UniProtKB/Swiss-Prot annotation:
One term of GO molecular function: oxidoreductase activity
Secretion signal span: 1-21
Organism: Aspergillus clavatus (strain ATCC 1007 / CBS 513.65 / DSM 816 / NCTC 3887 / NRRL 1 / QM 1276 / 107)
Superkingdom of the source species: Eukaryota
Name of the protein in its database record: FAD-dependent oxidoreductase oblC
GO biological process: terpenoid biosynthetic process
Matching Gene3D superfamilies: 1.10.405.20, 3.30.70.1990, FAD/NAD(P)-binding domain
Names of required cofactors: FAD
EC number, UniProt record: 1.21.-.-
């Protein structure tokens, strides 16, 4: 399909699919200076992992793009704190990557060297963060048992090759894919793998009640392999460098709008393309694009400006998610040589903690700074807790641990040096929705109304596999329709 931008504008205004909150007159080019009208092959909304990768990939393939990001930076969950005293970077959120071709090619493109990432530090201390008292884990499998359990897990995972291309499931969906993961664990005797699965992937809510397919979406064969053989990470231990370099390149080609937000959208099928009104620090911009690629979490409150169809509203309205938060704390009085994990004696066979709560505290690359992760259970709310409520709970948790263990930890006044909310995290749906074909219906949206979709909801919370999904599936679909 080859469409001029002049005909694109005419087609859109003639379309019967209009935005209820913004009549077509709002999109009249006469309301915009020529410098404020941006014409591109593809408009990408959301500058996180998948959106940034897709914009760069499309650009490399000769397509004109405009990437629109609400925040003042790219990277999404990839956040890096630079210690002002030493210049040492400390990554939060996204830490490591799989040793696969798409990862190595992407970092090489921006001249960022990789090597084997540091192993995750094993906890030597377990406390019930509700009380501050020490907990003794009752289930401590040996390495051989863990390996055998992961092998049994992979034997079941491998029955569903469609998982490489998203969440492509058999029809009808087998009951095994929507049963609670805890029942699946018992059925296949993979208990020894569960502590690793839980602590490697915080932010999923109640792992044992999650439907099996929601666990499969993150714990891919690539993830299991990386846990066994090692992950990759930037040599300079600064994941955000990837995004600052992508940001510089996109700015240079006038392909990026930061601190910007779509306020109205006009989408239609056929040759009509899409029109967007974007609020930017420099005023309103009118975007005329042949295709739209949405790469942020598809929650209804975030999608309000995008003129959703009844089908889109129905599907996206089914999502639940978890709150997930990260931060760095100084003056914690916690050790610099081991991590501390949350546990609750007698709660599940694995002494998993009650949520919402901090998962763990771990030493960072800067002595005296502790990396903390915190999460909630599943919720329909996109932003389940305020940042201030989470930070207050974390500080109170540290003080409880100090008070109950004066022989181990010094009493201090902890302070945050940085904090970030990654909510809504790990979008998923309930068992009955999976049974009723939610994912099959979801993927039929790709390409409708000149709109494509990528991001964790379409694959999983894993940057390496999001890049693979975007490169192998989504970007080719977008280009085919241009």
């Amino acid at each position: 399909m080859h469409l001029s931008f002049g005909s694109l504008f005419a087609c859109l205004l003639a379309s019967s699919t209009a935005v209820a909150s913004a009549p077509p007159s709002n999109f009249d080019v006469a309301n915009f200076k020529s410098a404020d009208i941006i014409k591109r092959d593809v408009a990408v909304i959301g500058g996180g992992s998948a959106g940034t990768y897709s914009a760069i990939s499309l650009k490399d393939k000769g397509k004109s793009v405009i990437l629109i990001e609400k925040k003042g930076r790219l990277g999404g969950h990839a956040e890096t704190y630079i210690d002002p005293a030493t210049g040492t970077p400390v990554d939060m959120g996204v830490l490591v990557f799989h040793n696969i071709t798409v990862v190595k090619d992407y970092f090489k493109r921006f001249d960022i060297p990789l090597n084997r990432a540091d192993d995750f530090m094993k906890s030597e201390f377990y406390f019930d963060f509700r009380t501050g008292r020490a907990v003794t884990p009752t289930f401590t499998p040996q390495a051989e048992e863990v390996s055998a359990a992961f092998a049994a897990y992979l034997a079941q995972y491998s029955k569903y090759p469609g998982l490489r291309n998203g969440t492509i499931l058999p029809s009808p969906v087998p009951e095994e894919l929507y049963m609670p993961f805890g029942k699946f664990v018992e059925k296949y005797g993979i208990q020894a793998a569960i502590p690793s699965m839980y602590y490697f992937n915080p932010g999923v809510g109640d792992i044992l009640s999650n439907p099996v397919i929601e666990q499969f979406r993150y714990w891919s064969s690539d993830m299991v392999r990386s846990v066994a053989t090692g992950f990759l990470g930037p040599v300079r231990r600064n994941v955000s460098e990837l995004y600052t370099r992508a940001e510089a390149e996109l700015f240079q080609s006038s392909s990026l709008l930061l601190s910007s937000e779509v306020v109205h959208a006009l989408r239609a099928d056929g040759e009509s393309g899409v029109m967007l009104i974007v609020r930017t620090p420099a005023g309103r911009k009118l975007i005329l694009a042949k295709k739209l690629l949405i790469a942020f979490p598809p929650k209804l409150d975030f999608l309000a400006p995008f003129d959703l169809s009844a089908t889109e509203k129905s599907l996206f309205g089914k999502y639940i998610d978890a709150g997930y938060y990260v931060g760095l704390v100084k003056n914690s009085g916690l050790p610099n040589n081991t991590s501390i994990s949350n546990a609750a004696q007698g709660h599940t066979d694995f002494t998993f903690p009650y949520l919402p709560a901090a998962y763990s505290f771990a030493p960072s690359a800067v002595p005296g700074l502790q990396l903390v992760t915190y999460a909630t259970g599943q919720t329909t709310k996109s932003l389940p807790l305020s940042d201030e409520a989470v930070k207050a709970d974390i500080i109170n948790t540290i003080k409880r641990i100090q008070k109950q263990n004066p022989d181990k930890f010094t009493s201090t006044e902890p302070e945050f040096v940085t904090f970030a909310s990654h909510a809504p995290y790990n979008l998923q749906v309930r068992a009955e929705d999976i049974r009723d074909g939610f994912y099959d219906k979801l993927y039929t949206l790709q390409g409708q109304r000149n709109t494509h979709w990528t991001g964790a909801a379409w694959k999983g919370e894993d940057s390496s596999l999001l890049w693979t999904y975007s490169e192998e599936i989504v970007v080719p679909q977008v280009i085919e329709g241009l």
